[in-house]
C-alpha cells in the first residue's frame, strides 16, 4: 500500500521526458512505473498528461528574517511564495539580523527557520572579515555552503572581504570540502564611479547602471577565478549579469577548475529598456544589462554555459523603493523572486522555444542540488529521492499580480507581465503543500536539509 500515486505524468528530467506514474511512500519516491493499474494507494492524483518535474531548488534566497520586527521578510510568508512558485527547497543566504557568521547565529537561524518555514530549507554560513574560525564550526553543524561579498556589502553587518581575506576563506572552504559563493563586483571602482555620477547630477536608473558597469563585474570575476585556482575550493559566481562574465567562468571550467556560473531570471527577463517603466523596482546588483546582452545570455543558458539559476529573492518595504523614482540612490537594492522565477522561465524560455524543459530542470533543480551536496535527496525524481514534485500547466494564461503575493512585500519587477505556464500543484516529501495558488500546510512543515556526499555532487 502506497501513500500517493501521481498518475499520467509526463516526467521531466535532464535526460528526457517519459510517460510514467510516480508512487510515494513515507515521503520518498518508492517506484516509477508505466503501469500502476493494480497498485493501491491512500490518495491518487491524476496529472492528466501534464508535465511533472522535480521541485525547484533555489540556491539564492534572502528572506532576511531573524526578528519579527524586521522589515524585509518573514520565513512563514515568503515560504508560502516559494510553495506557490514551485520552489520546494530554499537555500537561505546568511545576510540576516544578526548575520549567519557564527555557530551560535547559525544554530539560532536553523531553529527559527525550522519552526516557521513551509518548504524545506538549507542554510549558508557567511565568510566575512574576522570569522575564519567559525567556518569549520558552521560546516560541521550542517551549512551546505558559504557566502562572501567582494562588493555591495552591508557595512558593519556583512562586510565585503579583501583579496587576502577571500583567499583565506577559499583555503578554509577547500579544507572543509564545502562550496563558496561570491558576489563578484569591484567595490572601489563602484565607489569611484558613483562619486563621479552623483557629482554630475545622475539620479535615474541609467545612472545606477552606469555606476556598476560590466567591466568591473568581470574584473572581480577574474580575480575570484584566480584565487580559486590557487586555493582549490568549489566556487560559484552568483548572479552573473553579462555574457562575457559567463564566458570567463566557462573558460576556467573547461581548464579543469571547479567553478560554476549562476545567473537569474531578472537578467533573462528584464533589460535596461525596461528602466523607465519599472524604475527602482528593478534595482538589483549587479544591474540588469542591455537587450543585446540578454539575447546572448539566453543562448548561453540553452547551450550549457550557465550552470544554475537562482532567484536572488530579497524584499524591501515599498517605502524603501518608491524614493528611487526621483533619486535612485535612495532606493533599496533587491527584488522579490520566489513566486515568479519558474513562471517567468516557463513563459519566456520554454514556451518561446528558447529553453527546453530538460535544460530548465537541469539548471533549476538537478545542478543546484548536486553542487550543494543534497542530490539525489533533492533536485531529482528517482527511487529513494524525496517526493518533491511539481505538476505544470504550460497553457495557463495570466499576468503577474504582485498585490496577490504571499510574501511580506507586494511588488515585483515583473508586475503586470504576461505569464504562460506555471506550477498548479507543489508536493514536498509526498505532501501537497500548494495547489492552484492555495497553500495547504502549516508553519514548521519545512525540514532542514544538509550535505550528503561531496563526491557524489561532482
Swiss-Prot record:
Cofactor note: Binds 2 Zn(2+) ions per subunit.
Modified residues (N6-carboxylysine): 147
GO terms (BP aspect): allantoin catabolic process; purine nucleobase catabolic process
Pfam families, A to Z: Amidohydro_1 (PF01979)
Cofactor(s), by name: Zn(2+)
Keyword Cytoplasm tagged: no
Entry keyword Hydrolase: yes
GO cellular component: cytoplasm
Enzyme class: hydrolase
Family under the similarity heading: Belongs to the metallo-dependent hydrolases superfamily. Hydantoinase/dihydropyrimidinase family.
Quaternary state and interactors: Homotetramer.
Protein name: L-hydantoinase
Name of the gene encoding the protein in the UniProt record: lhyD
Amino acid at each position: 500500500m502506497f501513500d500517493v500515486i501521481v498518475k499520467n505524468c509526463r516526467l521531466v528530467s535532464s535526460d528526457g521526458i517519459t510517460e510514467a506514474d510516480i508512487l510515494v511512500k513515507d515521503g520518498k519516491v518508492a517506484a516509477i512505473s508505466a503501469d500502476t493499474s493494480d497498485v493501491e494507494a491512500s490518495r491518487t492524483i491524476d496529472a492528466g498528461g501534464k508535465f511533472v518535474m522535480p521541485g525547484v531548488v533555489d540556491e539564492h534566497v534572502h528572506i532576511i528574517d531573524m526578528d519579527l520586527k524586521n522589515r524585509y521578510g518573514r520565513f512563514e510568508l515568503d515560504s508560502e511564495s516559494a510553495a506557490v512558485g514551485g520552489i520546494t527547497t530554499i537555500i537561505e543566504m546568511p545576510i540576516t539580523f544578526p548575520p549567519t557568521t557564527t555557530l551560535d547565529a547559525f544554530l539560532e537561524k536553523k531553529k527559527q527557520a525550522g519552526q516557521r518555514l513551509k518548504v524545506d530549507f538549507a542554510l549558508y554560513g557567511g565568510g566575512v572579515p574576522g570569522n575564519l574560525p567559525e567556518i569549520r564550526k558552521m560546516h560541521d553543524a550542517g551549512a551546505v555552503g558559504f557566502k562572501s561579498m567582494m562588493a555591495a556589502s552591508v557595512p558593519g553587518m556583512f562586510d565585503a572581504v579583501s583579496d587576502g581575506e577571500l583567499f583565506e576563506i577559499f583555503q578554509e572552504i577547500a579544507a572543509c570540502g564545502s562550496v563558496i559563493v561570491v558576489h563578484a563586483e569591484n567595490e572601489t571602482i563602484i565607489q569611484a564611479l558613483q562619486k563621479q555620477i552623483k557629482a554630475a547630477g545622475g539620479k535615474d536608473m541609467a545612472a545606477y547602471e552606469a555606476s556598476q558597469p560590466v567591466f568591473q563585474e568581470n574584473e572581480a570575476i577574474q580575480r575570484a577565478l584566480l584565487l580559486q585556482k590557487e586555493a582549490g575550493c568549489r566556487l560559484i559566481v552568483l548572479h552573473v549579469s553579462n555574457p562575457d562574465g559567463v564566458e570567463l567562468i566557462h573558460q576556467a571550467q573547461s581548464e579543469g577548475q571547479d567553478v560554476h556560473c549562476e545567473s537569474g531570471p531578472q537578467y533573462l527577463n528584464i533589460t535596461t529598456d525596461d528602466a523607465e517603466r519599472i524604475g527602482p523596482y528593478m534595482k538589483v546588483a549587479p544591474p540588469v544589462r542591455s537587450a543585446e546582452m540578454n539575447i546572448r545570455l539566453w543562448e548561453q543558458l540553452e547551450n550549457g554555459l550557465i550552470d544554475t539559476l537562482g532567484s536572488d529573492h530579497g524584499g524591501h518595504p515599498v517605502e524603501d523603493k518608491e524614493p528611487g523614482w526621483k533619486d535612485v540612490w535612495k532606493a533599496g537594492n533587491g527584488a522579490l523572486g520566489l513566486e515568479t522565477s519558474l513562471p517567468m522561465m516557463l513563459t519566456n524560455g520554454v514556451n518561446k522555444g528558447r529553453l527546453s524543459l530538460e535544460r530548465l530542470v537541469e539548471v533549476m533543480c538537478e545542478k543546484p542540488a548536486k553542487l550543494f551536496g543534497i542530490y539525489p535527496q533533492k533536485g531529482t525524481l528517482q527511487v529513494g529521492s524525496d517526493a518533491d514534485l511539481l505538476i505544470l500547466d504550460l497553457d495557463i494564461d495570466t499576468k503577474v499580480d504582485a498585490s496577490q503575493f504571499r510574501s511580506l512585500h507586494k511588488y515585483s519587477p515583473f508586475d503586470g507581465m504576461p505569464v504562460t505556464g506555471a506550477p498548479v500543484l507543489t508536493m514536498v516529501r509526498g505532501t501537497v503543500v500548494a495547489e492552484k495558488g492555495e497553500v495547504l500546510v502549516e508553519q514548521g512543515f519545512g525540514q532542514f536539509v544538509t550535505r550528503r556526499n561531496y563526491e557524489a555532487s561532482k
